[in-house]
Amino acid sequence: MSESLDNSAINQLIPEIFDQMRHNAARTRDAKKPSAMVEESGSITTQSLLRELETLDKVIATIRSIDSVVKGALPSHMNKIHHVCKSTNKMLDNWINIQSQAGYAHHIMDSRTGSKTGSNSNEEVVEQYKQEIAELQKSIKMEEDKLIPAQVKGNGNGPTGQRLYGNSYRQPTGRVTKATALRNARNRPSGIPQISSRLTRPTASSNLKRQR
């Protein structure tokens, strides 16, 4: 097979591959679109294929240059050959990734999320998102306000801010016991000296001794 036949086969095969990729990505989407939108999408696909063909021509030229370098390389140039092959594989992987992401981006732009804003400007789109964020923040604030009374009730806080420790808590009363009154009297400072010995009444014999 000659080189011209190989190039013609590649030029016919590559557009078919990309067209099939986009057809698979947009199969479910195109069924719901009107005919005018389908025709517009087809024209966009044709333009993108032409751009891809130009880029592929540059890639093919690069591959040919690499092939000529490898053919004239010596065994001592194996490290360079390995580096060239690794770079070429990375370039091809990135190219495939670009094509996949392009189809995915095209799908997102035509999805309901992408067409939600319609023909609105960027400022209107940003304003709509700000309103949605404000509504979400308002809903979160309302939910937090509902949770605060439930937490206060669960902690057992009374209306006066005092915590009730079960049934063991008792309100203080105005009654004072005898032991408390005696303790307070002992602790109260006074000028009367305290006598540690016990006071007893004098007996009749002690009175007679004093009279003598």
From Swiss-Prot:
GO cellular component: a single term: microtubule
Localization: Nucleus; Cytoplasm, Cytoskeleton, Spindle pole; Chromosome, Centromere, Kinetochore
Top-level taxon of the source organism: Eukaryota
Biased composition (Polar residues): 193-212
InterPro entries reported in the protein's UniProt record: DASH_Duo1
Molecular-function GO term, any one: microtubule plus-end binding
Annotated stretches, region: Disordered: 150-212
Coiled-coil annotated residue ranges, if any: 118-148
Main location: nucleus
Membrane-crossing residue ranges in chain numbering: none
GO biological processes: attachment of spindle microtubules to kinetochore; cell division; mitotic sister chromatid biorientation; positive regulation of attachment of spindle microtubules to kinetochore; positive regulation of microtubule polymerization; protein transport along microtubule to mitotic spindle pole body
Keywords recorded for this protein, A-Z: Cell cycle, Cell division, Centromere, Chromosome, Chromosome partition, Coiled coil, Cytoplasm, Cytoskeleton, Kinetochore, Microtubule, Mitosis, Nucleus
Subunit record text: Component of the DASH complex consisting of ASK1, DAD1, DAD2, DAD3, DAD4, DAM1, DUO1, HSK3, SPC19 and SPC34, with a stoichiometry of one copy of each subunit per complex. Multiple DASH complexes oligomerize to form a ring that encircles spindle microtubules and organizes the rod-like NDC80 complexes of the outer kinetochore. DASH complex oligomerization strengthens microtubule attachments. On cytoplasmic microtubules, DASH complexes appear to form patches instead of rings. Within the complex, DAM1 and DUO1 may form the microtubule connections.
Family: Belongs to the DASH complex DUO1 family.
Chain's role: Component of the DASH complex that connects microtubules with kinetochores and couples microtubule depolymerisation to chromosome movement; it is involved in retrieving kinetochores to the spindle poles before their re-orientation on the spindle in early mitosis and allows microtubule depolymerization to pull chromosomes apart and resist detachment during anaphase.
The name this protein goes by in its record: DASH complex subunit DUO1
Native organism: Candida glabrata (strain ATCC 2001 / BCRC 20586 / JCM 3761 / NBRC 0622 / NRRL Y-65 / CBS 138)
